[in-house]
């Protein structure tokens, strides 16, 4: 059946079809990891003295690890209604010498949970690299525009001047905090290890004739073979699903941060201040050919909503895990976590494309600043007046009255700074303010140095070890 004739997830076929995550989260990789976990278990058991595990059996498993008879596996699972045992039988069929020691002492969650954790870890490693590149691209945009003066906005209304670069590092800070959350999760991530059917390790204690030190060594050795620094000391049949919730929550922070950034970009594109990349042959609307819609930022917002809402499901999976184990988690985890990882990848890929082509509509930005500078100079006037002994509250009241009157006048004509400061109250500071207005950067405070300092002192050091300096620009297929 052709791909177009059946439903497949849009994450893997539309937004992430060229991503390594599609392979990392695939059935083939999962099954390969299960077999690798059986190999590691056999190796560790042999190293610790189990006579029934031979080098011949281990070598046989290694030689057949990637040999899959999927028709046999599917038939076995239909019959047994148990995926791990279906794979166990399939592996044993092609490894007759090892068949008797495959899965020795283990329970299904030994391969299921541990393989999931390896796949999650490898996915996170890729996502962190992508995330670092996204933040780096935004940092470059911010530095390039650190002196481009623009109107700040609070409550979506005109506020004190900022620079485009300073606004950019505000966005970068939100993304960086989400990045740090995910990186911290990755560093603390724990492996399930070998725990047995209910987490007691009784089967392994039996195999090692009651030698607890060897059971502990087995757990530690398999963890090291899987290249994990940390492991759970206590589990039921499964590892705590709270760890899954922490992963999902870390990615939900990415969603929330990205939605804030992309909503801002959409608003600023509507104001005519920014323009997300719009390709030569791109069509904005089938009905309105003149439109340049911020469709990439809109897509990011849609993907972000999926991440923002995901923790609720992860928390219910955690809450419904009964006693040492129930299957309440199984179907949900199979869908939720791969979807969350792929959604994060799709979001970051699109964000990278936006930041690599985001442009400032400088002429319009300058015009908006010129229209508002007559009002925005008044805040600095208030500070100067207080330096001369004027009561701050009195200055605020006069400026408020003057500004509101000028705003009404602005509806029918252009207002300049001399008009807003015509009151004799401003005589002592008027000339100084008028002189400053000729160069609006004078009203942006420490925007330039804040931008430079944040990038140099916090952003770059945080992402440096994850950043691939050779990362290519993103070209979106859709």
UniProtKB/Swiss-Prot annotation:
GO CC annotations, alphabetized: cytosol
UniProt KW Lyase keyword: yes
GO molecular function: (S)-2-(5-amino-1-(5-phospho-D-ribosyl)imidazole-4-carboxamido) succinate lyase (fumarate-forming) activity; N6-(1,2-dicarboxyethyl)AMP AMP-lyase (fumarate-forming) activity
PROSITE patterns: FUMARATE_LYASES
EC numbers for this chain: 4.3.2.2
Catalytic activity: N(6)-(1,2-dicarboxyethyl)-AMP = fumarate + AMP; (2S)-2-[5-amino-1-(5-phospho-beta-D-ribosyl)imidazole-4-carboxamido]succinate = 5-amino-1-(5-phospho-beta-D-ribosyl)imidazole-4-carboxamide + fumarate
Pfam families, A to Z: Lyase_1
Domain of life the protein comes from: Eukaryota
Keyword check for Lyase: yes
Sites where the protein binds substrate: 14-15, 81-83, 107-108, 237, 299, 325, 330, 334
Biological process per Gene Ontology, one example term: 'de novo' AMP biosynthetic process
Gene3D superfamilies xrefs: 1.10.275.60, Fumarase/aspartase (C-terminal domain) (1.10.40.30), Fumarase/aspartase (Central domain) (1.20.200.10)
Active site: 155, 285
Pathway the protein acts in: Purine metabolism; AMP biosynthesis via de novo pathway; AMP from IMP: step 2/2; Purine metabolism; IMP biosynthesis via de novo pathway; 5-amino-1-(5-phospho-D-ribosyl)imidazole-4-carboxamide from 5-amino-1-(5-phospho-D-ribosyl)imidazole-4-carboxylate: step 2/2
Entry keyword set: Lyase, Purine biosynthesis
Function statement: Catalyzes two non-sequential steps in de novo AMP synthesis: converts (S)-2-(5-amino-1-(5-phospho-D-ribosyl)imidazole-4-carboxamido)succinate (SAICAR) to fumarate plus 5-amino-1-(5-phospho-D-ribosyl)imidazole-4-carboxamide, and thereby also contributes to de novo IMP synthesis, and converts succinyladenosine monophosphate (SAMP) to AMP and fumarate.
Family label: Belongs to the lyase 1 family. Adenylosuccinate lyase subfamily.
Quaternary structure (record): Homotetramer. Residues from neighboring subunits contribute catalytic and substrate-binding residues to each active site.
Entries under PANTHER family matching the protein: ADENYLOSUCCINATE LYASE
Name of this protein: Adenylosuccinate lyase
Species of provenance: Caenorhabditis briggsae
């Amino acid at each position: 059946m052709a791909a177009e004739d059946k439903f497949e997830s849009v994450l893997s076929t539309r937004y992430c079809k060229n991503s390594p995550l599609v392979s990392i989260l695939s059935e083939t990789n999962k099954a390969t990891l299960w077999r690798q976990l059986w190999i590691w278990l056999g190796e560790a058991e042999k190293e610790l003295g189990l006579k029934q595990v031979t080098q011949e059996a281990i070598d046989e498993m290694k030689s057949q690890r990637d040999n899959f008879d999927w028709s046999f596996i599917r038939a076995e699972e239909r019959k047994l209604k148990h995926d791990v045992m279906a794979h166990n039988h399939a592996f044993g069929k092609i490894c007759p010498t090892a068949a008797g020691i495959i899965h020795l002492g283990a329970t299904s969650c030994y391969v299921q949970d541990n393989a999931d954790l390896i796949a999650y870890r490898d996915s996170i490693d890729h996502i962190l690299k992508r995330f670092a590149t996204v933040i780096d691209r935004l940092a470059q945009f911010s530095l390039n525009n650190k002196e481009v003066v623009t109107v700040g906005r609070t409550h979506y209304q005109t506020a004190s001047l900022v620079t485009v670069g300073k606004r950019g590092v505000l966005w970068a800070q939100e993304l960086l905090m989400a990045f740090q959350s995910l990186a911290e999760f990755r560093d603390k991530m724990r492996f399930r290890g070998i725990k047995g059917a209910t987490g007691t390790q009784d089967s392994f204690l039996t195999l090692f004739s009651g030698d607890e030190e060897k059971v502990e060594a087995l757990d530690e050795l398999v963890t090291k073979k899987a290249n994990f620094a940390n492991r759970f000391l206590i589990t039921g049949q499964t590892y705590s699903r709270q760890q899954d919730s922490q992963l999902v929550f870390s990615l939900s922070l990415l969603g929330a941060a990205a939605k804030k950034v992309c909503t801002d970009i959409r608003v600023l594109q509507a104001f005519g201040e920014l323009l997300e990349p719009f390709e030569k042959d791109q069509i904005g609307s089938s009905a309105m050919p003149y439109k340049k819609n911020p469709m990439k930022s809109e897509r990011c917002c849609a993907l972000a909503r999926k991440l923002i809402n995901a923790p609720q499901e992860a928390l219910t999976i955690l809450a419904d895990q009964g006693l040492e184990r129930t299957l309440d988690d199984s179907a949900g985890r199979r869908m939720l976590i791969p979807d969350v990882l792929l959604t994060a990848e799709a979001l970051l890929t699109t964000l990278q494309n936006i930041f690599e082509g985001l442009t400032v509509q400088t002429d319009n930005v300058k015009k908006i600043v010129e229209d508002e500078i007559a009002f925005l100079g008044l805040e600095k006037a208030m500070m100067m007046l207080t330096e001369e002994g004027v009561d701050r509250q009195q200055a605020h009241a006069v400026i408020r009255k003057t500004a509101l009157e000028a705003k009404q006048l602005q509806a029918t004509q252009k207002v300049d700074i001399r008009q807003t400061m015509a009151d004799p109250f401003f005589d002592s500071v008027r000339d100084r303010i008028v002189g400053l207005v000729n160069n609006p950067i004078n009203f942006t405070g420490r925007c330039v140095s804040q931008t430079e300092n944040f990038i140099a002192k916090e952003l770059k050091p945080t992402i440096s070890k994850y950043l691939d300096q050779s990362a290519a620009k993103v070209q979106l297929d859709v």
